[in-house]
Amino acid sequence: IIPGIGSTDVAKNNWAGIAIGSALAGTGLTIGENVVGMDMEAVVKEGRVTDTRDLKRRVKLYQDHQIDGYGAIVVQANVEDTRLGAQEYAVRELGVKCVELKWGQGAKNIGGEVKIKDLAKAQELSRRGYIVLPDPNSEAVITAFQRGTFRECERHSRIGMVEEEAFARRVEELRAAGAKYVFLKTGAYRPADLARSIAWSWKYGLDLITVDGAGGGTGMSPWHM
């Protein structure tokens, strides 16, 4: 399975080759975090996504080239994706069968930030539930931006933390929405945390765990862990 490739330009600009190639090979492919939230053409009503451009395109490219049902397209979600209902939308509207929960920032100690140079986009991301710094809705910030005092905001994704009750509830919600397979992606954290992820995944019937590498991975990796 190809691990999560999310909203970055590297993924977006090369998605056709990745999706079609992995589908023809019968290899699973994971759509990473923030794809819905960063899609400025996505339709979000009352805090929940009802239509998308980017996610729909990514899923369809894979599905259209699958052979005899081999492989799988997987939709990953972080905190913001979950609040937007991205996985429920993918399952119900796009026919996705596999979803992946994400703890932390995978192989990264911290991170999840993106530079936003367009004030209107920063404001929309704030409305969609992201942490945007400085606050793009502040009158003082708007004035300073228009004067050229600064030229970009930072969008931050929240670090996914979990308690057992909430984890069990989320797995059940995804099953009820129609997900056939539920995966978990976590990092190479403390042995106690790895043991917890394995124990809970077994207890609540998850189908696959991905342990993101401490010596590699994506984004700001590798880090000494």
Please report, for each region that a protein language model flagged, where it lies by residue:
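N-terminal capping/small domains of soluble enzymes
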Residues: 1-125
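Residue-level detector of functional hotspots within protein domains
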Residues: 13, 85-89, 145, 153, ...
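Glycine-rich, proline-tolerant flexible connector loops at the mouths of alpha/beta enzymes
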Residues: 32-49, 103-106, 131-132, 137, ...
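Serine/threonine-rich low-complexity intrinsically disordered regions
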Residues: 51, 115-118, 135-138, 164, ...
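Short low-complexity stretches enriched in small and charged residues
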Residues: 53-58, 136-141, 162-169
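Sequence-level detector for tyrosine residue identity
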Residues: 62, 70, 89, 130, ...
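Carboxylate/His-rich catalytic cores and anion/metal-binding grooves
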Residues: 111-116, 123-133, 196-211
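Glycine-rich phosphate/ribose-binding loops and adjacent secondary-structure elements
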Residues: 147-225
